[in-house]
Amino acid sequence: MYPKTIQKLIELFSKFPTVGPRTAARFVFYLLRVSKKEREGLTSVISNLKNVNFCSFCFKTFESSETKGEENLCKVCRDASRDRTLLCLVEKETDLISIEKTKKYPGLYFILGGTVSKLKKEDIKKLRLEELEERIKNPKKFGLLDTNFKEIILAFNPTVEGEATMFYLERVLKKLGKKITRLGRGLPIGGELEYADEETLSSALESRR
């Protein structure tokens, strides 16, 4: 049996996605091998997570120091030069970052927080669907001025879960009377936006339909 501190750390690391007890134990013993300075550096960075907030509109993360405590919006949502008629829906923040890297998308985003598998009710409940509808209907309430979304882009992975999610969103959002499009050609079936190269993503954005 490991000492209590080590055991507790293993249990905490085991809660990370795709990390089991054995991998978690390797993490812990790696930390024990590095210098005290490196461990303290890691501890400091983790402690600074308390300064990370979620954007009140799109749920992207940002540090409170970025806004000087004046706003609850991320850098993208605060940018007045963005096209406020376009809203791109993504599963997670890493997908948003991948699209931003293309420098081909001028609009705003909303992070749904997951996907649905075969339209299971328990999956649907975990998504930010109510928050999404509220923000499309009344963006001003969440800090976005001069915003009127005309097109909603569904940017999800071309997987079974991604397709099911887009199908469900099309059905739910239809009543809002907005143009709804999907990413176009280029992304391989079963692939993930997070790992797509910039040229492929750019092509998919430009050929959306």
Annotate each PLM feature.
Residues 24, 79-140, 145-156:
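Extended interfacial segments that mediate partner engagement and assembly in macromolecular machines
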Residues 12, 16, 34, 49-52, ...:
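Conserved, well-folded catalytic cores of nucleic-acid-processing
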Residues 2-11, 15, 23-96:
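Cys/His-rich Zn2+-binding cysteine-cluster or related metal-binding knuckle/ribbon modules and their
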Residues 17, 36, 48, 64, ...:
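Conserved phosphate/pyrophosphate-binding and hydrolysis machinery centered on Walker-type P-loop NTPases
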Residues 29, 74, 87, 93-96, ...:
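Generic secondary-structure boundary/loop-capping signal
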Residues 7-11, 25-29, 40, 44, ...:
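Solvent-exposed alpha-helical segments within well-ordered globular domains of core cellular machineries
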Residues 105, 133-139, 149-209:
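Long C-terminal interaction/binding lobes of large macromolecular proteins
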